[in-house]
């Protein structure tokens, strides 16, 4: 079994395949980050609908949360671009 892994790690084809697999997983993570942002925005709109007087506080909190989620999505896309260029 060790011989199999030694041969596979030495081939360029196997390394390229793993790089593309990692890029695909990164794209999946970026897509899930987008879904999370949409859900957060939907909940913020519901909260403003229930308490319009707190809209400023809700909006600021939502924007900070969106920024934190967006950074992970951007990092995932950068990783995907790096891995797919190898």
Swiss-Prot record:
Pfam families: ATP-synt_C. It is a multi-pass membrane protein. One of its GO terms (cellular component) is proton-transporting two-sector ATPase complex, proton-transporting domain. Disulfide bonds: none annotated. Gene3D superfamilies: lithium bound rotor ring of v- atpase. One of its GO terms (molecular function) is lipid binding. It comes from the Bacteria. Keywords: ATP synthesis, Cell membrane, CF(0), Hydrogen ion transport, Ion transport, Lipid-binding, Membrane, Transmembrane, Transmembrane helix, Transport. InterPro entries: ATP_synth_csu_bac/chlpt (IPR005953), ATP_synth_F0_csu (IPR000454), ATP_synth_F0_csu_DDCD_BS (IPR020537), ATPase_proteolipid_c-like_dom (IPR002379), F/V-ATP_Csub_sf (IPR035921). The chain crosses the membrane at residues 13-33, 63-83. It is found in: Cell membrane. The record marks 70 as: Reversibly protonated during proton transport. F-type ATPases have 2 components, F(1) - the catalytic core - and F(0) - the membrane proton channel. F(1) has five subunits: alpha(3), beta(3), gamma(1), delta(1), epsilon(1). F(0) has three main subunits: a(1), b(2) and c(10-14). The alpha and beta chains form an alternating ring which encloses part of the gamma chain. F(1) is attached to F(0) by a central stalk formed by the gamma and epsilon chains, while a peripheral stalk is formed by the delta and b chains. Belongs to the ATPase C chain family. F(1)F(0) ATP synthase produces ATP from ADP in the presence of a proton or sodium gradient. F-type ATPases consist of two structural domains, F(1) containing the extramembraneous catalytic core and F(0) containing the membrane proton channel, linked together by a central stalk and a peripheral stalk. During catalysis, ATP synthesis in the catalytic domain of F(1) is coupled via a rotary mechanism of the central stalk subunits to proton translocation. This is ATP synthase subunit c. It comes from Acholeplasma laidlawii (strain PG-8A). The gene is atpE.
């Amino acid at each position: 079994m060790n011989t199999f892994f030694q041969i596979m790690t030495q081939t360029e084809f196997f390394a390229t395949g793993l790089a593309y697999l990692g890029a695909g997983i990164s794209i999946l993570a970026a897509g899930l980050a987008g879904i999370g942002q949409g859900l957060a925005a939907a909940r913020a709109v519901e909260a403003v609908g229930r308490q319009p007087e707190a809209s400023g506080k809700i909006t600021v909190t939502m924007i900070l949360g969106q920024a934190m989620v967006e950074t992970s999505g951007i990092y995932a896309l950068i990783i995907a671009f790096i891995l797919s260029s190898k």
